Amino acid sequence: MPRIFSNRNRPLHAGALPTERLPKQRSVDLRAVPAMRALRFEGPEGSIIHAMAEHQAMLDAIRDGVTNPAQSEIPADPAARTDHLKAFATFCDATLVGVCSLEPGDHLVNPIQNPEVATIAEALRTRQTKTLAAGIDLIMADLKESVSTPPGDMTHHQFALVFAYAQPRAPRLAEAGTDWIKGAERHRSALLGAETSTVLANYIRLLGWDARAHTETTSDVDLNRLAVASGVAIWDGVVLRHPFLPNGFALAAVTTALELRPDAPLASSAVTAPGQAVRDPYARRDFKDGAHPFETLKRVDQPTTYMDEPNIPRVPKRADLFARAQFGDMGPALQKEATGGYYVRKAAPSAAQRRALGAFVLLQDGAPAPVQQAVAPRTASELIKATSYFLGVDAVGISRCPEWAWYSHDARGAPIDPLHDQAISMVIDQGYETMEGSSGDDWIAVAQSMRAYLRFSLLGGVVAAQISALGYSAKAHTVMDGEVLQPPLLLLSGFGEVSRIGEVILNPFLGPRLKSGVVTTDMPLAHDQPIDFGMQYFCAACNKCARKCPSGAITAGPKRMFNGLSLIHISEPTRPY
């Protein structure tokens, strides 16, 4: 979301919108608010709604779980607790967050149930993952236990966190690349809301208090009533609205036994002031072009990093940095941190995110439809880019996927036969404020990584499912289960250049504050060219990062050839750090 006013001194829990400036009232009559209706993930043939349905069902299937019997030490003040949870939701990109008390009338007489949950729950109980990612066994065991346990009583839940996710604008008439996303605005926002509510409910349970997520497709409570009671929406007699969200929104909530501080409901007189509504980055740009002016970058035929492609060897998944740590190649200290995924589980926010990340592994590579639909490569690329940006990806690039970009063997040692020759690289922005506030070796750093990895796993998985529905093979390569080397593909697709800080690809608009993911496919696509924005000349002359690096990991020397690539290498003695 673009910045509306300076937030240098604005606390994160206050959110990006100045809702504190809106008039409030002490209480509100909820009897006039219409009952919530379930959102069905149904749409015309070819719509992205169908591809989103399975991922929405997965989030609905894991919305509840086992509560940690040991309660953590948290602030005793309900206001401090509320601010913490609001900040977490804002960090997860919730547009608005509100809190209200949960009243008996807020419970649905007939709870809403996603009809696809039963199928997903059976998959969680019976399917086996192929990945050996650290801690995947613990995640899958937890998920199996959760879906095998019937939902318990929630009458002891006294409070609700309510989230609103702004809907993007509707595609313009004849806008290129938008055939898949027409009519999917609410479904897209509901999916993102489901992600946040599922993560925060799990987070509260990890702290030792019972909590359950409620979405537009599966809910035990009336989200419309909660939205009005928490100040997230106003019922104007016709529609639920918020003064700052002119395109509408989708709702999600977390009910909990944890005591929180309720917000005051909005007064019916609340109106939009000039310049305060959400500014849509796509108001004057097509979805296929992205929010950033990528079209202004200088395009070149070859990446600025030399690649000796005939001599680039394929390496096994066992050579992956996380695998090396897990198997003890980098010393006993790092092996201990990697055991069971402890480096993620030691912080509750990242542990909460990793649960959903593990669940999506089962959805990464679905079978293609039996009938293949012909789509021109240029049209297919526009459809994929527009859909990805519409869903919330921050940057998308398309390139060939050479055989040397694939691992030679998977985590189990089985040979990998490259099935796809096309790569769709995607980037999730980790956020300037988050990067600025983290030391890189704290719980913030882990949570910001897991947030970005989870977001790609969700959105990349949806795009892969859409391609599979057209009859082409596709796979989302995530941090939990990937079979390709991503940095070279980012270079080929024009995301950025290699800098002195190592193998991280630096983007001219996002810098290094990004996490990437790749969807590979055999669907013919039009490719993007690599870019050259002067990074190589700049890094050769600057050396400031090498001088200031506290661990000495960044070297000041020239590039060296390694595995067929010309790179500036990280100091080997500092790799365990």
Model-inferred region functions:
Residues 270, 537-555, 571:
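Local cysteine-cluster metal-coordination motifs and their immediate loop/turn environment
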Residues 1-536:
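Auxiliary alpha/beta "docking" domains used to position bulky ligands
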Residues 568-577:
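Single conserved hydrophobic/aromatic residue that forms the stacking wall/gate
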Residues 536, 554-567:
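Active/binding-pocket-proximal capping segment
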